[in-house]
A protein has these predicted regions:
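Short, extreme N-terminal segment that most often corresponds to the first beta-strand
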Residues: 1-14
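Generic hydrophobic, helix-prone segments enriched in Leu/Val/Ile
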Residues: 6, 60, 82-83
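Charged, amphipathic alpha-helical segments
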Residues: 16-27
Length: 98
């Protein structure tokens, strides 16, 4: 699991979701309006649905944790959506990290 630091809060999410979110933020153009994305996460050990608003200038940090990566309901779908969004805005030449 990775810790997502956003707007003063820490959320735990799967490694794949965290990586896909960072990949998406990385390719966002500066002139694109804010976009809300939904990801599965853990907060205080309980599953939650997190909604974050992203722009190219959004300060987002991701750190590794000692918590074993586990399945969260909707994590595969969230990764697919984030990857599609990244491909859409990045255009030709986008290669997601795997």
């Amino acid at each position: 699991m990775k810790a997502l630091l956003y707007a003063g809060h820490e959320l735990l999410t799967t490694d794949d979701v965290a990586d896909a979110l960072l990949d998406y933020v990385e390719v966002l153009p500066l002139n694109q309006p804010p976009e809300r994305v939904v990801i599965p996460a853990l907060r205080d050990g309980l599953p939650v649905t997190a909604e974050v608003v992203l722009t190219a200038a959004t300060p987002v940090a991701v750190t590794t944790t000692s918590i074993r990566d586990t399945h969260l309901e909707g994590d595969i779908y969230a990764v697919e959506v984030l990857r599609r969004k990244a491909e859409r805005v990045a255009g030709i030449g986008y290669e997601p990290r795997m």
